[in-house]
Amino acid sequence: MLVAVALVCIFCIGHGSALMPSETKEELQQVQGENQKQQEEQDAQASKPSSRKSVGSVTAIGDSVMLGAAPAIQETIPDCVVDAKESRQVKEAIEIVKSLEQQDTLGDTVIIALGTNGPFDVSTGQDLIDQIGKDRTIYWVTVYGEYLQWQDESNDPINALAKQNYNVYIIDWAGAAVDHPEWFWKDGIHLRPEAYAQLLLTSIS
């Protein structure tokens, strides 16, 4: 439909502009511009996966959700170093990344699994991404909890950050988990490790 409209616009503007009211010309030009913008966004998204580097060494930074799955993650992704802690917030990860960089132990691929313990804003998330650097591939795991009140408040900035940073990708744990209650323990938040670890491996491979 977009292509058809664009062709009509080009024909009208190129061959019949003298016969068209100025308002109609402006509307057609606006539609043509919107079509071009949509196409550019689609092209940018399509080209994004090709910018991924090989996985290489992997660092995973998370909270208690990742902590519970740490042994399974390390077994499933042997080159992965897991740094996870209960009640960890996004802003705390900035200092962790700084420390790992100073020790020259931050992986080529960084998995972030934070946001379960409270919402955060895009600015804080961007500070973390900037600290990790554009030369690394980042995967941010969306949060999920059957009774997690701020799930959307955490996932909205995660999705926004992936859109505005070419090296940031989403691991949609929330999307995958909603149809699989059997993946979780009784609290509806903490998960059975094997499913989580396998999702991480599949997403970064």
Annotate the PLM regions.
Residues 59-61, 139, 169-171:
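Hydrophobic/aromatic beta-strand patches that form the interior of the parallel beta-sheet core
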Residues 134-137:
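A short helix->loop->beta-strand "cap" motif at the edges of active sites that frequently abuts
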Residues 14, 93-96, 197, 203:
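Glycine-centered structural positions embedded in regular secondary structure
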Residues 151, 155-205:
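Catalytic His-Asp segment of secreted/periplasmic serine-dependent ester chemistry enzymes
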Residues 1-59, 103-106, 165:
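N-terminal secretory targeting modules
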Residues 51-127, 145-152, 156:
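Conserved SGNH/GDSL esterase-like catalytic core that processes O-acyl groups on lipids
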